[in-house]
Amino acid sequence: MTEPGLAPAPETAVDEVVGTAREALLGAPTLGAPEYLRFAEAVSEGAGRRWAEVAEANAQDVEDGRARGLSGPFLDRIRLEERHLELFGALSRSIARELPELVRPGPVVTGLGGLRARRVPKPLGVVFMIYEAKPTVTVEGALVAVCSGNATILRGSTEIAATNAVLADVLADALVESELPAGMVQVLGDTDRNQFRELLRRDDAVDLVIPRGSPSLVDYCRSATGIPVIVGGSGVNHLYVHESSDPELAVRLLLDSKLPEPAGCTALEMALVDEGAADAFFAVLAERAAAGDLLDLRLRVPEELIADLPEELVAAQPVEPLADHDDGREYLDLVLAVRVVDGVDEAVDHIRRHGSGHTEGIVSGSAEATERFCRRVDAAAVVVNGSLRLHDGPTMGLGAELAISTGRLHVRGPVTIDALVTHTWRIEGNGAVRFLD
């Protein structure tokens, strides 16, 4: 018997999963109906009521991951804390604020024979999300997709199976409380790869795929499906420190871009430091290291520079020689590479060769250097004199976010609720024809 809140087991045909989702869409209220607001509230309240169960299941997932030898940063991605419950409440409130604008029709345009046309928002349909670790995505994916009128199929990784089982029940209860069709959210209870692959082939029933995870997961989804994909891409991100920058500011931004969430998609992987800024930069970095501010951060620096680094830095932090394979690498760990470059052009050329097009940054006191960098760097976001972690939907004031897309079509940057809505043109013809008259 299938556990409450979980989708059918893998031996059940994928037809049942997609059929349930399509049927739910047919029975769902129109976009903007009050049931969607009630669902957002019910998810937040339900998570609060059952937080002890969620926390217990999550602790089991973390312990299982530790026993399997998962890294500390990866375990941090699995771990839920009280702040995440607060996040769910904030997400629900944010969606409530965004829905009126989301459902507002576009302006009326007048055409041939006095016809009147306007764009009317419509849900995309069935959204299939695949993600690794991060059980917060289970709640975020359900809230953003359902409140924009879509049915969603959620497939988390094995590492969060226990947490997802409880969250699936929370979501199922919220659908009942809000009187939405039960099939609007399906949390797959088994991470069977055959089921996953078959769902990617169902372009007749699934309208959008959103993968969040490793580059290999994202690349597989792109190559294995004919369904449109919003890519939550990997973050091989750089921070360029121009010679005109304040070294104190540069180091502060570097640390905030790396330490709080080293496995996050906006985490800094390599600092590109101007030759003219290197001495002051490393001196400040050494001061912060001596004060314990770098935590367990491991540095990778060109071998020829290691001997010239401040003694305090080498004494406080592990420093390893930088290798060619470190270029373009997403560490997903407390590892930071540093390269010294000869000006803006060399920094930009390095980013063009090795960046992933996610988030790039510059620390600079020169308007000319900043403008040159921003014009030449092609990424979903370019941050000027700020932490790379500012590239975040809620932080930017854009509202709830599902992922950060590195694609070029439909959406680039934060994937907010409006990215899950398409439009229908409503044309009032008033009897107009094109040719017969």
Where are these regions (language model features)?
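Conserved small-residue-rich beta-alpha loop and adjacent elements
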Residues: A90, R97, E101-A174, S178, ...
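Short, well-ordered beta-strand elements within core beta-sheets of diverse protein domains
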Residues: E23-T30, A271-V273, D333-D342, G357-I362
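A structured beta-alpha segment of the ubiquitous adenosine-cofactor-binding alpha/beta core
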Residues: E81, R116-R119, V187-D203
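Solvent-exposed alpha-helices and their adjacent loops that cap or buttress functional pockets
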Residues: V109, A117-P123, V146, E177-P181, ...
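C-terminal core of ALDH-fold dehydrogenases
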Residues: R38-A42, V344-D437
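N-terminal Rossmann-like NAD(P)+-binding subdomain of aldehyde/semialdehyde dehydrogenases
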Residues: M1-A117, V144
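Residue-level signal for inorganic ion chemistry
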Residues: Y36, V127, G149, V209, ...
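ALDH superfamily catalytic-core signature
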Residues: P8-T12, E132-A151, V166, V170, ...
